[in-house]
Amino acid sequence: MLIRRIKCLRYLGTRYNSSHYVTTPIFYVNAAPHIGHLYSAVIADAHCRYQRLRYPEQDVRLCTGTDEHGTKIQQAASLHGVPVAKYCDDISQRYREVFRSASIQQDDFIRTTEDRHKRAVANFWRTLHTRGHIYSAAYSGWYCVSDETFLTDSQLRLDEATGTRYSLESGHPVEWTEETNYMFRLSQFQDDVRHWVKTEARVRPAKFEKILLDTLSEPLPDVSVSRPSNRVHWAIPVPDDDSQTVYVWLDALVNYLSSVGYPDEKFSAHWPPAQQVIGKDILKFHGIYWTAFLLAAGLEPPGQLYVHSHWTVDGQKMSKSKHNVVDPLQAAQQYTMEGLRYFLLREGVAHSDGNYSHVKAQRILNSELADTLGNLLSRASAKSLNPGQIYPSPSAEHLADLLRSLDVAKRLQDSLLQLSERCESHYECNHFHLVADTTMAALHAANNFFESSKPWTLKAGAPDGNQARLETIIAMTMDALRLSGIVLQPIIPQLANRLLDKLSVPTAQRGWNYLAESFATSPNSSNSPAGLGESRQLDGQTSALLFQRILEETSAKEVKEQKPQPAKRSKSKKKERRETMS
């Protein structure tokens, strides 16, 4: 098998390759971005942020961008009454604005209308053609204009009343088309593609691997990889044949190569991608076509396809006709963009569709970010309790006594001791909701400890005043906040950094390795804030009000500063999806 020869090369390449290259799908500019597009981007961004945090020696690279060719783009531009190029510029810029607002830390934003990409597509085409994998043939079949693909009879349903056929997958109508196209010998790569899908957890979650294998259980027909230029002119011309343009999906998939410098030799420093994040609607194109194209070109397929499901809105599919498409920038006005990031990664799971609702978002963000996290910081740094505004060092004597005498102190210690290992395991699988679960459990333990130890009874002037014990309680609480802030950096980077700024944690001490240093790991040390040295001043320039509670029917601009509410667990029933499929 061809793939076995490529696997031999992989050991030589990855053995010396410190690159961790991650991609989002490039987003089709036939419409403005919605939360489903943002979800793809925040998954990839959180994954890359974790990789940088956990493996600082690794060269992590994230690529995103926009897909700008094809019939649907021509139609959308015409509908808006603007030239196609200007339409593409405008929509592509909106994606940039959304990603910038959401703190997506991409290293490259590729557009398929760029010259570097056109050059890569031409080279890739010539490689496939020279190797004998592309041939010209008369082709006829059912063509879906909306999906820009030919479909077989088994992929269609017939409306008996009208005689119209529709795609089973998308529901869009198809039309019979006869034309001369270039064809790709997909049938020759069926065994190789199946072998790739079945080995080494290539496709995750596992349900999507099964979907691909079910598709591969039937013979694969060769596929059309060009269109007549008189029908699809907004596209890249086929090299040496101006009568044809490159099929939009072949064009679009090559972006992953264009972004790292293909066809120049430098691209091999980043190839293959460690992980490609995609939505379930484009699984076939990536899992079968893309894999086959790469094998045909003599290139290694990606390390893993990470496939996520879609978002409904109040239980209904998002659609323009229902007027329920959620604009990320508008949603951010209500929840802040950090809040929206948290909600998407907290509530979304890859193997099943997530449901977006204002009620749910408000409940989760108020309960977890405003109360459980934000309120604990406000209480520990309150001037009435902490007039010196310090992150103190604990007393070894009082630390030992608290751990011995208070069950809640021991539970907090146990929770923090497990935080690093558990969250690392969840991050490695992109199980961001479980990272949030684990971190919130630690913060609940910290809130319970703080409440049970009653630090307000120990402050100066109180009958039981004991400054050393008070500072030890504050130090233990701030250790829990600091560790939580480090863990949450990939999910809510701006909010986590504000938390760590308030605690005066130096940038150099925000790495994953600092999760190993706290009162929990060094209970006999008198120098605890996690090995950070002596007591330090809190940052007076950073507000202790970390996340404002969201009020019903108000925008973020209208929310006035409010007194933090006591932290409490949400009474909502946990979703059965918490046991995540691997």
Curated annotation (Swiss-Prot):
Protein's GO biological process: methionyl-tRNA aminoacylation
Keywords linked to the UniProt accession: Aminoacyl-tRNA synthetase, ATP-binding, Ligase, Mitochondrion, Nucleotide-binding, Protein biosynthesis, Transit peptide
GO cellular component, one term: mitochondrial matrix
Residues annotated for ATP binding in this entry: 320
Subcellular localization(s) per the UniProt record: Mitochondrion matrix
Transit peptide stretch: 1-95
MF annotations from Gene Ontology: ATP binding; methionine-tRNA ligase activity
InterPro entries attached to this UniProt entry: Met-tRNA_synth, Met-tRNA_synth_2, Methionyl/Leucyl_tRNA_Synth, MetRS_core, Rossmann-like_a/b/a_fold, tRNAsynth_Ia_anticodon-bd
Annotated region described as Disordered, given as residue ranges: 555-582
UniProt cross-references to Pfam families, sorted A to Z: tRNA-synt_1g
Chain span(s) of sequence motif 'HIGH' region: 27-37
Listed Basic residues bias regions: 566-576
Taxonomic superkingdom: Eukaryota
PANTHER family according to UniProt: METHIONINE--TRNA LIGASE, MITOCHONDRIAL (PTHR43326:SF1), METHIONYL-TRNA SYNTHETASE (PTHR43326)
NCBIfam families: metG (TIGR00398)
Similarity comment text for this entry: Belongs to the class-I aminoacyl-tRNA synthetase family.
Protein's UniProt name: Methionine--tRNA ligase, mitochondrial
UniProt source species: Drosophila melanogaster (Fruit fly)
Gene: MetRS-m
